[in-house]
Amino acid sequence: MIRVGNGFDVHQLVEGRPCIIGGVEIPFAKGLKGHSDADVLLHAVSDALLGAAALGDIGKHFPDTDERFKDADSRVLLRHVVALLKAKHYNIVNIDATIIAEAPKMAPHIARMVQHIAEDCDILADCVNVKATTSEKMGFVGRGEGIAAQAVCLIQKYQI
């Protein structure tokens, strides 16, 4: 059985927080606001994977009302999601993700983001694609108020 998942996340940019995207701390004057480390890319990827396996979303598994997830490393959360998929006998076929941001520039960091996602998902880097775009100065992203990310994944059930 082959299944597709789609994930989306958005976080506000604020002063006094690190800007962590795809598990990479990006030098920038602002960071993403959230209960965890607010890694918008890994949250979108996690939601896509959970959705593909019909396991709900990250809010269900890592609620922002639970202090255990305060400032949590989203790479740890992603690895937990992958363990849930493996428990249901799913392999990840591929992940394709898009970061939507006016700033900071993502291009210098994308290779490391891909590597982190591949490592955390236990798949080859060739199976992960991350790209970035802007919103052409429109909306909250265009005004530099936040960053969004979306992800799609393909998973496949394997025989045991």
Swiss-Prot record:
One of its GO terms (biological process) is terpenoid biosynthetic process. Its EC number is 4.6.1.12. Keywords: Isoprene biosynthesis, Lyase, Metal-binding. The record marks 35, 134 as: Transition state stabilizer. 4-CDP-2-C-methyl-D-erythritol 2-phosphate binds at residues 9-11, 35-36, 57-59, 62-66, 101-107, 133-136, 140, 143. Binds 1 divalent metal cation per subunit. Pfam families: YgbB. Pathway: Isoprenoid biosynthesis; isopentenyl diphosphate biosynthesis via DXP pathway; isopentenyl diphosphate from 1-deoxy-D-xylulose 5-phosphate: step 4/6. The keyword Metal-binding applies. A divalent metal cation binds at residues 9, 11, 43. Gene3D superfamilies: 2-C-methyl-D-erythritol 2,4-cyclodiphosphate synthase (3.30.1330.50). Its cofactor is a divalent metal cation. InterPro entries: MECDP_synthase, MECDP_synthase_CS, MECDP_synthase_sf. One of its GO terms (molecular function) is metal ion binding. Belongs to the IspF family. Involved in the biosynthesis of isopentenyl diphosphate (IPP) and dimethylallyl diphosphate (DMAPP), two major building blocks of isoprenoid compounds. Catalyzes the conversion of 4-diphosphocytidyl-2-C-methyl-D-erythritol 2-phosphate (CDP-ME2P) to 2-C-methyl-D-erythritol 2,4-cyclodiphosphate (ME-CPP) with a corresponding release of cytidine 5-monophosphate (CMP). NCBIfam families: ispF. Homotrimer. This is 2-C-methyl-D-erythritol 2,4-cyclodiphosphate synthase. It comes from Methylobacillus flagellatus (strain ATCC 51484 / DSM 6875 / VKM B-1610 / KT). The gene is ispF.
